[in-house]
Amino acid sequence: MNRNILSILFDELHVKYTKKYLSELIEGHPYKYNLYGFSQILTMYHVENKGVQISKDDIELLDAPFIAYAGHDIVVVKNLTREKIEYYWQRRWIQSSVEAFCEIWDGIVLLTETSSKS
């Protein structure tokens, strides 16, 4: 079974889940391919989340992990410093400069925070 974006994010957030149930939940969701659907599933797992669009100049203000829309796809950002970023895209982890990431990123993110119920 291929890992999906939400299982990658849940691992980074240390959220308990089963791969089978999460996969079934995603497959049955009408908005499984966009941030709205991801937000609904995160809420089901008691992960607080909020979709925002920010200026690329403010990327360093974000706390990883989070979901971002980049390269016409959805990615999970694992680590972020002023100069480097590490993110999961197209089934692999990529490390690049923040500047290079900002060239493919449109400024849209889904910020996440776990709770005691997550």
Task: Please state what every model-predicted region is.
Residues 2, 32-61:
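Contiguous, structured surface segment used for ligand recognition
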